[in-house]
């Protein structure tokens, strides 16, 4: 008999993560690599683990993730968001805990576009009085 699998989609900046969870031993696979293999920075690994640690499920679930787009920081945030959604699908009672920690809300901050006549999004050319 097949195990029950729970799914959640997470987004952050331009990264999109599809997160699948099932009961297991706490193994995390991201694009067919281990968590340590995929994320070199400790901060990114911590961000991914935050949602599981908030509900104390670190060694009770196996997590399989497919993530595309963005950079390491955005991908870590997308995985955390997707994981929070998958955990809510698993047990609705986890929602208040995850909501209080801020993992359910999609971080809507995106890169501001560069404007014509400016160096960057807001950086103006140097002003010369004479």
Curated annotation (Swiss-Prot):
Tell me the InterPro entries matching this sequence.
Ribosomal_Su5_D2-typ_SF (IPR020568), Ribosomal_uS9 (IPR000754), Ribosomal_uS9_bac/plastid (IPR023035), Ribosomal_uS9_CS (IPR020574), Ribsml_uS5_D2-typ_fold_subgr (IPR014721)
BP GO terms, sorted: translation
Stored Gene3D superfamilies: 3.30.230.10
One example of the protein's molecular function in GO is: RNA binding
Q: Name one GO cellular component term.
A: cytosolic small ribosomal subunit
Keyword Ribosomal protein among UniProt keywords: yes
- Per the record, the coiled-coil ranges are none
User: What are the alphabetically sorted keywords of the record?
Assistant: Ribonucleoprotein, Ribosomal protein
What family is this protein classified in? Belongs to the universal ribosomal protein uS9 family.
Annotated HAMAP family: Ribosomal_uS9_B
Q: What is this protein's record name?
A: Small ribosomal subunit protein uS9
């Amino acid at each position: 008999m097949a195990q029950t699998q729970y799914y959640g989609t997470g987004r952050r900046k331009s990264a999109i993560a599809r997160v699948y969870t099932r009961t297991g031993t706490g193994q995390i696979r991201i694009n067919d690599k281990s968590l340590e293999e995929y994320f070199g920075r400790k901060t990114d690994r911590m961000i991914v683990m935050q949602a599981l640690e908030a509900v104390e499920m670190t060694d009770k679930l196996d997590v399989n993730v497919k993530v595309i787009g963005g950079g390491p920081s955005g991908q870590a945030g997308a995985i955390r968001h997707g994981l929070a959604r998958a955990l809510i699908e698993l047990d609705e009672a986890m929602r208040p805990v995850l909501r209080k920690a801020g993992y359910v809300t999609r971080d809507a901050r995106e890169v501001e576009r560069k404007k014509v006549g400016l160096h960057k999004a807001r950086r103006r050319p140097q002003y010369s009085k004479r």
